[in-house]
């Protein structure tokens, strides 16, 4: 008997599970994925690159094992101990072939641009894009909790620009500053638009033939996330 699975639905379900780790900050990974796609689109990327950025954004914190760790990641703009969960998340994904391509950028998604620039390729750019979108969301999430997102946009843009050429790739920051001039970039981060975005992406996702071994791998990923 042939087995089929919608891997888009698997990624989205994993993202929903990760939201439970955040408790007080749901949709963090979803917002990171949405922003990563918007920034990449500004750079003229193709649909395959955008799909990878979206999936990597959804799952970038798959290595976060507790609400306490999640809280530190979303409260501290830059934290020396952040690399551990990136390594663990990459290890988890590397062992699951359908999502193994996400492991390299996720491993590096808290690495500063200054540590990447001497060997900077597609993987490193994707990793720094995740880092950028992740840190934007840390700032935006606080503003949303205070119901002051649009009021705080200038300060968020200024803080991100202050780390250009240090934490973040200058080209990515330029793209962010360009696309984030529009209110629509920020309004898309609210809960309703985020869920609408997820629904649109899921609607036409194809079924893929798979094996029992792959389905067992899916179960293993879920067991790590919700343990």
Residue ranges and their predicted role:
Residues 1, 15-16, 34, 137-140, ...:
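Regulatory/sensor and coupling segments of signal-transduction and defense proteins
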Residues 77:
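Surface-exposed, glycine/proline- and aromatic-rich loop segments on solvent-exposed faces
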Residues 7-14, 32, 52-72, 80-91, ...:
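Alpha-helical scaffolding flanking metal-ion-dependent phosphate/phosphodiester catalytic sites
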Residues 18-25, 41-49, 65-67, 117-123, ...:
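Short alpha-helix-to-loop micro-motif enriched in aromatics/charged/Gly
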Residues 42, 84-86, 159, 194, ...:
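Short, surface-exposed, polar/charged, turn-prone segments marking secondary-structure boundaries
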């Amino acid at each position: 008997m042939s087995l089929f699975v919608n891997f888009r639905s698997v990624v989205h379900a994993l993202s929903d599970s990760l939201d439970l780790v955040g408790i007080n900050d749901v949709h963090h990974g979803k917002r990171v994925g949405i922003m990563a796609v918007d920034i990449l689109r500004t750079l003229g990327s193709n649909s395959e690159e955008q799909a990878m950025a979206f999936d990597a954004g959804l799952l970038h914190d798959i290595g976060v094992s507790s609400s306490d760790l999640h809280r530190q990641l979303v409260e501290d703009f830059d934290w020396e101990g952040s690399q551990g969960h990136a390594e663990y998340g990459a290890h988890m994904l590397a062992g699951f072939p359908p999502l193994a391509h996400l492991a390299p950028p996720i491993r590096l998604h808290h690495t500063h641009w200054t540590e990447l620039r001497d060997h900077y390729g597609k993987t490193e750019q994707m990793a720094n894009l995740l880092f950028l979108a992740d840190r934007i969301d840390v700032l935006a999430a606080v503003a949303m909790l205070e119901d002051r997102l649009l009021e705080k946009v200038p300060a968020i843009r200024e803080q991100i620009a202050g780390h250009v050429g240090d934490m973040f790739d200058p080209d990515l920051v330029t793209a962010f500053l360009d696309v984030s001039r529009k209110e629509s970039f920020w309004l898309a981060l609210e809960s309703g638009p985020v869920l609408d975005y997820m629904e649109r992406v899921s609607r036409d996702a194809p079924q893929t033939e798979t094996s029992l071994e792959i389905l067992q791998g899916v179960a293993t990923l879920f067991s790590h996330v919700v343990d």
